[in-house]
């Protein structure tokens, strides 16, 4: 079976070896754990953002950039594709691990989750778990992890701490904006999984989302990066699953009762409590499904340029 950690390790090794060329910085801790800073104390950029996102996807996704526009305003877009959507998105990219050790906090994603089984139910549903002697984790945090944090990750992954590798970037950073927009496909796969659909029937997935401008405040940055997919994420899924027609009206974000405002405003109204937000909002704006068994195509949802530009501070 494919090892998402083995594939991601290849990308990490290249990033570590040529860190300066990625506007990143490589660190080896006293216990042997290795870290590449992609934005905490470094500039990062598109090249680092691509590597970070592809690491998150366990080496089973491809990332490209292009210039597009939203209502005539030039905007960078990220394009993501994968032929292993269930494993790459749910088994690796999903931010399913809250890493908290002492005063350190980070949202953990990436292939290390498939060793630690975070959360276990996800891996039971998709029928996957990894078996490799190194763990590669992506941490969304304003701070680099110390040795104690890396020891904790190693213990959870059942590997030696010297075999733990982490890439780190804050939400409010160029790489932060890139890698969250790079979750546009994952958002669609995650939504279908939450609806009870068997995502292993999805053969391939491709999607795009605008890369929002970096905000100074982490909470506002989180709002913009979520809005990139909620209001302007466009996804195409190829699958063999005639039953998908029963899920169509629940997939896009515009079916959520919270839809229509920038995410920051919704979050503020909810007193910055995620548990008060309608989770169905976390969906792509527009989805096309090519169902191969019956040879049909479905199209649901629509992009919302107005809210997207308002969120980005361009309207």
Curated annotation (Swiss-Prot):
GO terms for cellular component: cytoplasm. Its EC number is 3.5.4.27. Catalyzes the reversible interconversion of 5-formyl-H(4)MPT to methenyl-H(4)MPT(+). This is Methenyltetrahydromethanopterin cyclohydrolase. SUPFAM superfamilies: Methenyltetrahydromethanopterin cyclohydrolase (SSF56199). The gene is mch. InterPro entries: METHMP_CycHdrlase. The keyword Hydrolase applies. Keywords: Cytoplasm, Hydrolase, Methanogenesis, One-carbon metabolism. Belongs to the MCH family. CDD domains: MCH (cd00545). GO terms for biological process: methanogenesis, from carbon dioxide; one-carbon metabolic process. Transmembrane segments: none annotated. GO terms for molecular function: methenyltetrahydromethanopterin cyclohydrolase activity. It is an enzyme of class 3 (hydrolase). It is found in: Cytoplasm. It catalyses: 5,10-methenyl-5,6,7,8-tetrahydromethanopterin + H2O = N(5)-formyl-5,6,7,8-tetrahydromethanopterin + H(+). It comes from the Archaea.
């Amino acid at each position: 079976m494919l090892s998402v950690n083995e594939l991601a390790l290849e990308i990490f090794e290249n990033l570590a070896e040529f860190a300066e060329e990625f506007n990143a910085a490589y660190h080896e801790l006293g216990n042997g754990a290795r870290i590449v800073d992609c934005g905490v104390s470094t500039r990062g950029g598109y090249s680092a953002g691509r590597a970070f996102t592809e690491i998150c996807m366990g080496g089973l996704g491809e990332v490209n950039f292009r210039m597009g526009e939203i209502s005539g305003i030039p905007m960078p877009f990220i394009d993501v594709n994968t032929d292993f959507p269930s494993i790459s998105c749910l088994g690796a990219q999903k931010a399913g691990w809250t890493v908290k050790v002492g005063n350190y906090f980070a949202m953990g994603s990436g292939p290390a989750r498939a060793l630690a089984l975070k959360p276990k139910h996800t891996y039971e549903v998709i029928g996957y778990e990894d078996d490799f002697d190194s763990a590669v984790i992506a941490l969304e945090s304003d701070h680099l992890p110390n040795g104690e944090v890396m020891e904790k990750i190693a213990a959870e992954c059942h590997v030696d701490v010297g075999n733990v590798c982490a890439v780190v970037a804050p939400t409010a950073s160029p790489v932060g904006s890139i890698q969250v927009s790079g979750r546009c496909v994952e958002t669609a796969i995650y939504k279908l999984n939450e609806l009870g659909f068997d995502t292993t029937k999805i053969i391939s997935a491709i999607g795009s989302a605008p890369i929002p401008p970096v905000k100074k405040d982490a909470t506002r940055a989180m709002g913009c990066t979520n809005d990139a997919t909620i209001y302007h994420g466009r996804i195409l899924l190829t699958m063999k699953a005639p039953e998908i027609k029963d899920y169509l009206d629940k997939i896009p974000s515009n079916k959520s009762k919270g839809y229509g405002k920038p995410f920051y405003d919704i979050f503020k109204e909810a007193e910055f409590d995620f548990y008060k937000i309608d989770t169905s909002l976390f969906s792509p704006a527009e989805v096309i499904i090519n169902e191969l068994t019956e040879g049909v195509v479905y199209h649901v949802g629509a992009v919302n340029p107005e809210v997207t530009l308002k969120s980005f501070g361009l309207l």
